[in-house]
Amino acid sequence: MRYAVICMLLLAASGCTAARQAPSPEPGLVPPPVVTTPEEKAENPGSLFSDENADLLYADYRARRVGDIVLINIVENSKAENKASTSTNKESTGEYGVSSFFDRSKVGIIPGQTLLSGRTGDVPLLKFSSVSDFSGDGETTRENTVTATIAARVTRVLPGGLMQVEGSRETRVNEETQIVTVSGLVRTSDVADDNSVMSTQMADARISYYGKGVISDKQRVGWFTRLMDNLWPF
């Protein structure tokens, strides 16, 4: 019976804990977009010259159309530091008294009986003293480095020379899967001669690097430990 009561108390306490925000789902692999190329009718069917291969000798192979491939060089280095210090001190004292009450040196309700011994001018009716001190320090440091190269597809061409690109790469080694996804906006002028662009030149960039497998499972906290963290009040 005692164990049943303890279990009921634990369940009731777990219901009172604040609900944690559900983690955002991990981004999956981006499916390839459907690209339809309209058929162009030749103006002169009997001619040996074709506009489709007119620029093969001097063509620019940098990505600029929907469905083209562009290399994204992911080089992300970020470091943030924050430090705060607070110190406060407050001290106050005070005394309140009555020197005379209707020309009497003693204060009392019944004649001959006093509430205070001695003269009221010598003994204060109220005396207080207060001291408050506070000191707090906080410091945080975070550093992140991601380096990778991934091929992305142009999924949309926007006005102003912008291209929306999306790409993903999945690598599986010994039952451990590493997934890299990238998406964002790239200017056609930022694409280098080798058809590559730096991730630092992307706008609205979203880069994810995560894994699935035995190693990732070992790095997670167990469900019972997370439950006790929610129930433990201290």
UniProtKB/Swiss-Prot annotation:
It is found in: Cell outer membrane; Bacterial flagellum basal body. It comes from Oleidesulfovibrio alaskensis (strain ATCC BAA-1058 / DSM 17464 / G20). One of its GO terms (molecular function) is cytoskeletal motor activity. PANTHER family: FLAGELLAR L-RING PROTEIN. This is Flagellar L-ring protein. The basal body constitutes a major portion of the flagellar organelle and consists of four rings (L,P,S, and M) mounted on a central rod. It is a lipid-anchor. Keywords: Bacterial flagellum, Cell outer membrane, Lipoprotein, Membrane, Palmitate, Signal. Pfam families: FlgH (PF02107). The keyword Nucleotidyltransferase does not apply. The keyword Kinase does not apply. GO terms for cellular component: bacterial-type flagellum basal body, distal rod, L ring; cell outer membrane. Residues 1-15 form the signal peptide.
